[in-house]
Amino acid sequence: MIVMRHGQSEWNRLMTETGRDPGLADPPLTAAGLAQAHAAVAKLADRRITRIIASPYRRALQTATPIAQARGVGIEVSLLVRERKAYSCDVGSPKSEIEREWPDLDFSHIPEIWWPAENETTPEVRARAEQFYARMRDAEDREYTLIVSHWGFLLGLTGESFENGEWRKLKEL
């Protein structure tokens, strides 16, 4: 399984510049973030990818889209790989809005308001990551699956920090 953090978002850019939460809900990728997403197409070219699972946040879907298009693979949207709720960027867009932006993706299993109302604790994020890990352990195509997710979730899953646009091959499940 390959795990990847989304490209740089407007929230990431502003937070880096100011050191303060800029108050942006579900921010899009910056030009640099879009470039990171397109660069991933080339960087992952030698990897076999037959399945892509992404978080429903706009920044994850924008990162996954060029990879999916280059591979001719659909994107599965999963709430399990969403970001932990901690900052303004972790407030998502309503399902009806993201369905309009990505009409070819299946959001039928996601409620209109799908992000948590309260901030998540580290143990809660780890439990969600463990649930996802257990589910993937039984997936026959896990070795050829790309997960496009977020810093907090990937930290809970791997115990490691990821930069924007960074990907790694996860050790065998």
Placement of each model-derived feature along the sequence:
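Active-site-adjacent alpha-helix immediately C-terminal to a catalytic or transition-state-stabilizing loop
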Residues: Q69-G72, E130-L173
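Short glycine/proline- and acidic residue-enriched helix-loop micro-motifs
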Residues: G23, D104-P123
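Short catalytic/ligand-binding loop motif for oxyanion handling, primarily in non-cytosolic enzymes
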Residues: E10-R13, A60-T63, R84-Y87, P116, ...
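Active-site-proximal alpha-helix that buttresses catalytic centers in soluble enzyme cores
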Residues: I2-V77, E99-E101, T122, G165-R168
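A short, structured active-site edge motif that brings together acidic residues
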Residues: V73-C89, I110-P116
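Short, well-ordered beta-to-alpha junction loops that form the rim of enzyme active sites
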Residues: A54-R58, L80-V81, V148-G152
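A short, well-structured juxtamembrane/interface segment
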Residues: A40-K43, V125-R135
